[in-house]
Amino acid sequence: MKQLLAIFALLLSSLPALAQNNAAAQANIIRPGDNLVLENIPAIPAAIAEKAFQYGEVRAAALQDWDGSRREMLIITRFADVPQVHVVKMPGGARTQLTFFPDRVGGAHYGPKGSNYFTFVKDVGGGEWFQFYRYDLADGNVTLLTDGKSRNTGRAFAHNDNRFAYSSTRRTGQDTDIWIMDATNPKTDRTLLQLEGGGWGATDWSPDNQKLLVLQEISANQSYLWLVDAASSEKKLLTPKAGAEEVAYSGGTFSKDGKGFYTTTDRDSEFKRLAYFDFATMKPAYLTPDTKWDVDEFDLSDDGRTLAFVANEDGVGKLYLMDTTTRKYHSVSGLPAGQVFGLSFHKDNLELGFVVNSASSPSDVYSLNVPTGKVERWTFSETGGLNTATFSTPQLIKWQTFDSKTISGYLYAPDPKKFPGKRPVIVNIHGGPEGQFRPGFLGRNNYYLNELGVALVFPNVRGSSGYGKSFLKQDNGMNRDHTHKDIGALLDWIRQSPNLDGGKIMITGGSYGGYMTWAVAYEYNGKICCSLPIVGPSNLVTLLEHTEAYRRDLRRVEYGDERDPKIREYLEKTAPLNNSEKIQKPVFAAVGKNDPRVPWTESRQMLDKLKGNGITIWFLMANDEGHGYAKKKNQDFLFYATVMFVRQFLLGENVSAAAK
């Protein structure tokens, strides 16, 4: 009995030490939040975050709108967990936060000149059921304007008026009707047009606020512009289909005299040019006839005299100003090389606001004084204390694919002095699929370059935008697997490169890039080390059957209609889900439970089939996210888990929670 008591006493005396040891062990790992679901992801050593942490402490800013009466603006940036609305009252001034929500906020727009409010857009948990709100500047009160249930998008604001037109799925959950509301009185909300399809959106009001331009999008290659009477709802097709050619339009802005409108279109061209249509003749006058690149966006000054536009020149944004009377234009100098977007003229017609993103700087807001050419920087986003001047600059690369076409992309290489020899590679495939990788600030991805010596390649395979409408169509329907072969050719190009290690390649991508990651993982299993699909479809048939209804027909134009037996057979044959037995390398899949575009079950069904392959499978799901991670805490955990995955399965390191 005494012996038992002695043993019991010994056990009791050891409990504090055991508790201390357990606490120390817990302190040495990065703990996931209760909102995260993990499968097979080992405990992440806290040491991983010691250097990687800085790369996540980077901010960015996006211009939302100018104040109509003062020289100040609304921007979106993040100081806590998610982006919120801030006001900046001078170049380089303080970013004063106005909204405080647990979910991301965007689309902030001031009311008309003399008003004392702005409207903004917000969803919950990444579900993309966007609602409009009004923020009263006098007291900070927030009012819900829409129904709180449907998906509401695409606002167009009347001139010097509280009304705005917008798109909503309220009636059917699938079709986007056009509605009009007075932002100061939600009870004025009314339906302007009942429509079929999910691709409708108002773009502008006429100068007298009597009519609206409305864009109908069928696909990335096909869209139409309509003229709609704001009182009677009568609509007229302005851009009927002419012959067999599919034509795309982007945006639509009335001229100041109301006699015509500006838009960008690939009509009669491979690329989207800036054009003016006179209502009397409806014959286009191409304002940038010699451009060999897409015009990405444009904005017209309030007096109608100056038109600013951005040309996408091989992925680099070039800003131009045009005199609408002479139609002569010139480029704007003195800007960092990179992406330029978010154009917005001040009501004074003197200043143009925009955002610049470059390899050494995250997105920040600038202004241009049009008469003097003076450029001023309004925001200076933090970069985690990192010396961004030393960051890798992108190199344009090109390779021949299976059918002799030339495919291009961008290579970011580590410093050869710090990391000599052939370097491991991460191939990161963009989404869309009609997207385009454009060189700019890489954020957390700079960690792999600067700290691990891993090169990054961002391909623009066929079907990417920015290279002409013929190139954009080359992956449609039953040509889907041609894009896989473009990556296969890239893998061969990497193996032949004198500076890259073709034996150490990881594939990753988000959304459609996630689908491509799954596809490459099975088609080129022997040429890669591991893969990381993020919110990626595993079967385009099940994707089309389960994506939200308002998206389905738009995606069918791109992927093919799964209700057609021949298309369905092809999609099933090439689906990664139905070729899962060929994947024999480690996989890490990350999803958001509320994703309306690619349901999380796309990854779940794939991982369930992969379990029989006897390979390493990691899975991460955020219960409070959708199509990608918007909350910093979730981004951080995914980043640290990815770093561990890269170090273990691409670089071959022994990484564990016990590692120092």
Feature roles, as predicted:
Residues 63-72, 108-117, 155-163, 203-211, ...:
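Blade-terminus and WD-like Trp-Asp/Gly-His loop motifs, strongest in beta-propeller folds
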Residues 440-459:
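Short amphipathic alpha-helix adjacent to the substrate-entry channel of hydrolases
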Residues 451, 458-660:
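Active-site-proximal cap/loop segments of hydrolase catalytic domains
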Residues 377-420:
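N-terminal cap/lid segment of alpha/beta-hydrolase-fold proteins
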Residues 21-60, 88-104, 125, 135-151, ...:
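Multi-bladed beta-propeller domains
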